Regions:
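Short acidic-aromatic linear motifs embedded in glycine-rich loops, typified by GG[WY][YF]DAGD(H)
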Residues: 9-172
Length: 173
């Protein structure tokens, strides 16, 4: 079989370059490659992660419909889900798993990458990452108890969660 590739212009790459994004060269200026990750990590503190176009619905799932309802801080006076949900102590899996799913899908990978990229050469960024990591993860362990913390992304780990006591000791060491 004969396969022929042609293009209609010699500057195809220039025409199809996305000028709205950040280039690799831009990331090197003023340590942006580290600072950008810190912004994402900060969004995980009370989970205002922006899925685009100003959508901030994860906060409602991770906070309002979960802990706020369970603790009685917030209550929906209108029957929702047949009148049986977290404010009536009928815990809803989708609401209760939201903080875990969002944190481990979007925030903790950025923490992991930031720690690895800054540990040796950029101790200031590494220190800020560690502080933000505690700010993000203390809420997760307070919600769930044992969490995956010290062995996150360890290919040799069997993903046994750390006890809450071990996590808090790790926070302060």
């Amino acid at each position: 079989a004969l396969l022929v590739l042609t293009s209609c212009t010699g500057d195809f790459k220039d025409i199809n370059t996305d000028l709205s994004g950040i280039t690799d060269e831009d990331l090197q200026i003023d340590y942006n490659e580290h600072g950008i990750r810190l912004g994402v990590i900060q969004q995980g503190i009370y989970f205002n992660y922006d899925y685009g176009k100003g959508k901030n619905w994860p906060f409602q799932l991770t906070q309002n419909l979960n802990a706020d309802m369970f603790s009685g801080y917030m209550h929906d006076g209108k029957p929702l889900n047949g009148g049986s949900h977290n404010s009536d102590y009928n815990l809803q899996d989708g609401w209760n798993s939201a903080m875990w799913g969002h944190t481990y899908s979007y925030i903790f990978p950025q923490i992991y990458q930031s720690e690895n990229a800054t540990r040796e050469k950029h101790p200031g960024f590494f220190g800020v990452t560690k502080i933000l990591k505690v700010e993000v993860m203390h809420r997760v362990t307070d919600y769930y108890g044992p969490i995956i913390y010290s062995r996150f992304a360890d290919p040799n780990a069997e993903y046994m969660p750390d006890t809450q006591e071990a996590v808090y000791k790790e926070f302060f060491c």
